[in-house]
Amino acid sequence: MSQFTHLHLHTEYSLLDGANKLKELALTLKEQGATSVAMTDHGNMFGAIDFYQTMKAQGLKPIIGIEAYLHNHDELDDKSSRQRFHLCLYAKNEIGYQNLMYLSSQSYIKGLYYYPRINKKLLEDYSEGLICSSACLQGEVNWHLNTYSERNVRFGAKGYEAAKEAALWYKKVFKDDFYFEIMRHGIGDQRMIDDDIIRLSKELNIKIIATNDTHYTFKERAAAHEVFMCIAMGKKLNDPDRMRHSVHEFYVKSPEQMSELFADIPEAIENTQEIAQKCNLELNLGNPTPPNFKFTREYAKDHNIILPEETKEFSFDNDDMVFEELCKKGLEERLKFIDESKHEEYKQRLEVEINIIKNMKFSGYMLIVHDFIKVAKDKGIPVGPGRGSAAGSLVSYCLRITDLDPIPYSLLFERFLNPERVSMPDIDVDFCQDRRAEVIDYVIDKYGADKVAQVITFGKLLAKGVIRDVARVCDMSIQDADELAKLVPEELKITLDAAYEKEPKIKEFIDRHPKGLEVWEYARALEGLNRNAGMHAAGVVISNESLWKKTPLFRQSKNDERHLVTQYSKDHLEDVDLIKFDFLGLKTLTVINNAIKLIKKRYNKDIIWETIDVNDSKVYKTIQSGNTLGIFQIESGGMQSLNARLKPERFEDIIAVLALYRPGPMESGMLDDFIDRKHGLKSIEYPFDSLEKVLEPTYGVIVYQEQVMQIVQIIGGFSLGGADVVRRAMGKKDPEKMKKLKTDFADGAEKQGYDRAKAEDLWELIVKFAGYGFNKSHSAAYALITFQTAYLKTYYPSEFMAALLTSEENNVDKIAVYIDEMKKMNIKLLPPSINKAIREFSALEQDGKDAIIYGLGAIKSVGIPAVENLLEARQDGEFKDINDFLGKIDPTKINRRTLESLIKAGAFDEFGFTRKALFDNMENLSEASRKMAEVRKNAASSLFGEEELTSGVQVNFTPKNEEFEVMEKLGYEKEILGIYVSGHPLDRFYEQINAIDYVKSLDFESLKNNGEILSIGKIEDFKSMMSKNNKRYGRIEILDYYSSFDATVFESNVEEIENIIKDENLKNNAYGFVLGFKAEGGEKPSFFLKAIKDLQSLEDGEIKAIKKFGAKKDFKNKEENHFTAEPKEFEKNIIELDLTRLNRELIYEIHEIARNAHNPNEKNNKKLVLKVISAGSCLLYHTDFIISDSIVEEISNKYA
């Protein structure tokens, strides 16, 4: 068998060009008998570690290389020309690998101009340990030789002598490590220069290598690769002007095929093996070293600590000394809020944790995290109380990395760091979303831009996305592409093949659609490939030395040299000796911070969380009520229902709620079991009495991973470190390991005097629950944020809601939801006020009631500079009138457009003018503002004061007192504020609408599958269109009390809609819209209009054939309970029931009372209707029972 090594190969990391999937590639090469292979991705090393490990796993020698872009200018960042050449570089050894990383990094940091480029000066300086080849037709030598190309000649190709000169330069730099490449794909220009390359080879004594420009693994993938390129270029496959390959030879050819192609120059094949033998890079992966804290000496000086190695900048001993001192000082501060009788327990635990962290050499890591969190807090940047397993560490609490005391909640340090299984610490930190970047910038400033980088992430062509991309390229309609994509089940990481097996409708679509099979097969071929490179939302790495020595770097923007990004993804950072820190953005922290500021401003009161009881009963009444909108983690409809059922009474209950509200615990029955035990419907039992303390907080149910660890420790006699190893093994479900651990557990239990058989039964129970167990440390830390938001909503509702509105000021739909909540809370929303409003939404009292005033910063076309100028002008007191306002502002910042927006928003209402009067005098207002500004400018040289001079300039008002029509006034509010504030277009129909059961737009997210609903609103807009079949259809925009939404209108309703919108009075009426909907696979529901009804025609919210959503399974068996969802005409008795309080037993009791009282012959009896309320929605169920008013009253008193 011929020996040949592919040395010109593009993996899936040559974004939207290379389609070689690494695992598939490795298996193919192994089958072909290859022993080595190179990667030469375009301009990057993104896939180097992935490539290295994947090839090694199949017994292949990986050669890490790159196809670089080279320009011939003296300065690396020269942008005078876009001309660049290709060049292949291969790392022979560790030095070559280091130089390759540096070259790749510099190509992005300094050389980025359309492409990441290097120049010859840089290449020469960092050429050691590298092999170089002349690359493809775009290589400098080949480009000069190819004078057959008119384009080359036009841009300066000079033929053989110029090629020779270039080759001599490369030979001078790389000596015998420079090679000519010859490719034989059948491309005309390549064939024409072969002889010249061979001639140059002989003349200059430079060896030739045979290469194949490999972009995909199998020959039959050529067409899919064309589709791939179309995705990259935004072209369609049938576009005659798109770039396309003239041949389809860019696949992984076997050694035999390559030998046959180069039979005339067999040495070109042999030379590939020569390069392979020269490349002997062995990477030492998987031994990450935690970074030292660079500024230990400064901290020591500030805290009067004498360091053991005072002269060293980086020292583990120094880190240990400062770390221990800060921990102990931190504990002293924390103990001020802890009962003195427990102090010794805290000191002993801290000592244990400190010693473990020092032994694992993580002191510097902890100091780095402590430092950037401290700085963030000092700058007033909100920081979360903790997240993840770090919340189980007392050290974290003492260093104020977290703000949750782990001891009262039995949080385990070993869940964070296990001394028996060394792994890197992983502390994720939540910061205010708006100011997270400031913390990252602080770290960059402190450690240096070359030592800090964010982490790369790759967008992939996943199942739904690749279907849509391929469908566009293949010219399939958007609607059809959407239909096919939505058939893919909503499962994380599902593949197209798995989707095909699970969803029979996919095959039906493929069979009936003319392009179905083509799109599907291309999508399968391209699925999983990288689409683009981006930046990880949170990941940051910090290094003691320049990062390019561990990972090549890149940057996303050509204008941002400061914020660098690793070329290696998060999965490979530890492999190259780097530890990731996660700087996460959490909007809720900003809400809490803003609410606290508003409380301070209004009541002059500080909120000190350490002094507030986390078991405050009033707060838990709020949570139990289900009115949890805006409360962290528990505001969804499902969570509202759960809290109404569970009725949390203590902080431990919130921790459990956050851990249990997940598919696993809910589907397994754990959640129901937990609730039943809490309410005494099931007895609380413990497998052994010794486990009562561990399981009491969760009523005997194993909810947390920490409980698994404690059970293994107490019963099996394991250390907590050993128990953590057991927990991890349970997660991986290794049968052999599990069998041994079960024996160890039973042996340990028996040794401690426990019944072996009972212990083995307990092991099986643990294994079952371990699959659903949640990290209590994380749940507890987030439960603290839940409690804080619930506390603020309970005691300071106006300030909390104002902060919520500010956090969503650009999300009109969310603001509408919060305004609806404010109505329920009896808090009024006021329009912006020129004298009362600030940048954010704020709380105040009006007529003895709480109100929230619209924030100036949320007004469209006003902008922050205008707001700042307005607030500055108001510093000495409120504006007396419109002239006073105009006399103090800067007209360059508050210009005519800004004034117009403020008028439309109602900000000047308090000055006594109508909005229309101000609007009609806009020219006069602008002119007066400009003149007053000129007067102020000249006041310095005047004998008169500024106020005296400006008072001489007045607005020349055209006297008008009429106001805009109501709908026009509201329209302007909607235009400028995004919502209606002073009223709503549907207000005149409020009584009628309120009497009707309908689905609100804010409940649309609860819609599942397909069905029909009734919506109430007015028509905002309608667009008519013509289909391919020459049928009229359109899109209608409907406005209800909460937001606007679209629905498709088919031909049968188009004329009716057009007649309505032609008549202004009809258009402004409210209607009932019978809407069909599709909400499959977790997608947002799409609507289509079925009928329009006058409000008068809606009798108590009933329309035949309209079915409400969310039916509970208890009602589905008509034969069993006589309930039916089919509406009929009848006199009725309606009983309202809360769905969250219903269970099968209660339904049976109601059923029995109604059945026994059923008497259709009694004249005054009426049909029983159950009105079931759930999370804002309402369902009517019509029974077959005819009963009296007195029986209805009995049921209502007992169950309603």
Curated annotation (Swiss-Prot):
Name of the molecule in the record: DNA polymerase III subunit alpha
Organism: Campylobacter jejuni subsp. jejuni serotype O:2 (strain ATCC 700819 / NCTC 11168)
Main localization (coarse): cytoplasm
Catalytic activity: DNA(n) + a 2'-deoxyribonucleoside 5'-triphosphate = DNA(n+1) + diphosphate
Function, in words: DNA polymerase III is a complex, multichain enzyme responsible for most of the replicative synthesis in bacteria. This DNA polymerase also exhibits 3' to 5' exonuclease activity. The alpha chain is the DNA polymerase.
Nucleotidyltransferase recorded as keyword: yes
CDD domains: DnaE_OBF, PHP_PolIIIA_DnaE3
Major enzyme class: transferase
Single GO cellular component term: cytoplasm
E.C. code: 2.7.7.7
Entry-linked Gene3D superfamilies: 1.10.150.870, Bacterial DNA polymerase III alpha subunit, thumb domain, Metal-dependent hydrolases
Lineage: Bacteria, Pseudomonadati, Campylobacterota, Epsilonproteobacteria, Campylobacterales
Keyword Hydrolase carried by entry: no
Subcellular location: Cytoplasm
UniProt keyword list: Cytoplasm, DNA replication, DNA-directed DNA polymerase, Nucleotidyltransferase, Transferase
